[in-house]
Amino acid sequence: MEEHHIPQAVQIRNAHVHNLKNIDVDIPLGKIVGIAGVSGSGKSSLALGVLYAEGSRRYLDALSTYTRRRMTQAARAGVDEVLYVPAALALHQRPGVPGIRSTFGTGTELLNSLRLMYSRLASHRCPNGHYLAPSLRVAAGKELLCPECGAQFLAPSAEELAFNSQGACPQCGGIGTVRTVDPATLVPDDSLTIDEGAVAPWNSLMWSLMTDICREMGVRTNVPFRDLTAQEKEIVFHGPAEKKHIFYHNKNSNQAGELDFTYFNATYTVENALAKVKDEKGMKRVEKFLKEDICPACHGTRLSAAARAPKLRGLSLDEACRMPLSELVGWVQGVPDSLPAEMRPMAENIVESFTGPAKRLMDLGLGYLTLDRAASTLSTGERQRMQLARAVRNRTTGVLYVLDEPSIGLHPSNIVGLTGVMHDLIADGNSVILVDHDTQILKEADWIVEMGPEAGAKGGHVIAQGTIPAIEADPASQIGPFLSGKADTLRRKRALADALFAQGTLHLSTAQLHTVKPLEVDLPKGRLTVVTGVSGSGKTTLVLESLVPALEARIDGKTLPPHVRALDAEGIAHVKLIDATPIGINVRSTVATYAGVHDDLRRLFARSPDAKAHGYKAGDFSYNTGSLRCPGCDGTGEVSLDVQFLPDVNIPCPDCRGSRYARAAGLVKLTGPAGQTASLPELMDMDVNTAINFCRNMKTVCQKLKILQQLGLGYLTLGEETPSLSGGEAQRLKLASEIGRTQTDSVFVFDEPSIGLHPLDVQVLLGVFQALLDNGATVVVIEHDLDVIRNADYIIDMGPGGGDAGGRIVACGTPEQICNDPASITGRYLRR
């Protein structure tokens, strides 16, 4: 019998996606393969651009053209040959932020099983309020008969228990919140009189003659609002809709007249305007007078009274959704035993459909979350683990899982659960591709492929590959010293413990919010403070939902958020949140336009002899609106081809070859310091490092480019589209306008800035922090990366666990103090 050869590896030949330099590489199958390398070295190009693109495309190609035309399809990857690639699933680095209707329960699909449980297994209430014992008649779709009053009714289906469908609260529509008028916004300055415009809604949402009607209602309009009697203020805010006969004088036309007009109090003015809103522009005028409150009808549960009626083990659906997942699983497992014997087989099936996926989520450290938690309030790491759990719920075999930075948002103690899931996937006969920088998770790989040696045009090569010991011993490897622990990771001189607060203190006092208990927090001014803690311990709530909004409110002279009791931030005039959200969604935004270099270059080219000879102005050199933009692609650099039954194909514009400019733009040249010449399209095609050499004598341009180089972005080309940048690159580019300024009155807040950064890039990031600190800034960072934590002046460690088990400050101090604090889990990992 002929022996069949079973492929042992995916064979990639001559891959040239993005910056890959025609590489040949074999990726072992049935193993965890880590892909490492500095930012921009080609890791994602190999993992997502080749392996995932080909694995998913070939699977979709097996479907009928009728099915495929309804799907978004990937184009063929830029590679000569890929052999033995399995069907592929990718978990991207940054899952999209879900809408307001999405919760942890809907996102994980656990709520589907729970709703089915309540529909089929619960005690249902008859129209007269009597509860019936659980019955198999529900599953059979038969009517139920109330033994007490004889009423006949049908039990609600699972769909009728869904807040996104028939079970929605009629008042809030299943959102759980309602928009109401915020009284604090109606009279923002009570030192003004009503005649001077004290009542804000009457100025922007109502005719000016409402002041005259108010006067007719008996309110003095010529005294400061604060001096009005309580009765007069009540008329302004809630007065009755009485019709008044008034004389009015139109200041513009200088005409007078009289008319009958109904009084609209300040509150009703806003409510009336809200009811008439038809577009976003109208909403913008009204929303400054609104606040979001918990819906009074459903109390934030999103469900109608009927959907909250069924009871299972004594709890309603909304009460079960309020339990942390770890508790809920135990409660659900007790459901079959609480039912009549004939219902138990069905109950066990439904319970199993709930507990299987729930166990995965708990393995990934999400047991502290409740099913009713709004998905938009989850951190990136939590959303990514939700996505991972959903992808691995069905025990597949022979699938290639591509995980793009799964360690995002994970404390070192949470990575254990993640590695468990990866090993389970391998045990089931799958393959895992792991794009990551975290040495703790890379050590779990059976094989490492390292890309490099640098970023951008100088990357795209395989510089090392092999097992962990082989990589550690390979002198060409850049990740090897970090895997072996031999690299020096302390990169900055930290403040001494007794001088930490020498430049001042930021003090924040908060009441309970989500699972975070009331807190009193001190942060040293002019220092690098890192907020640490396991996932769900309250870092995001403390920094992004408390500190940042409180500072913004104080700077703008507004009231503090309701849960913030006090804030002492003397001398702070700016707070800047630098997160990893992509910069724009438009291909017209490039590194040069975002950094402000493009305008300077257009002006320089317009002053050149060539431009003057042709009569070109600076505006002509704009690839968005100028006369020199490419007419074929309108300055986008690419054209989209609509091929029926096949995916739309975006190709570089055949006219300008991706440069965005017409040929005439190539005739206008500037001369560099060494006598070389370049047109604006050629300059936009240079990376920052090369452009600095060419622009040495262009002072303003050179200064801006050197800041990008200082931020570790020297490998980006000036014409690179900003939406395509990684999270870490986007964060650093946002800082370009801040470096070099005096920042003593500024607080910079970073949300996991080490995302997507190789340990060598983390050292560049620490240099960026130091540049801000040298200019007097206060830097606050939410971070899990141990190298960043080690370099902090001050650490605030949240915990001890996630959810209800967290929400407290377990330790704070210098890294040495945290290491020696037995209560700190972070300290335990810092000591290693």
Regions found by a protein language model. Give the residues of each.
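Conserved phosphate-binding elements of NTP-dependent enzyme cores
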Residues: M1-R832
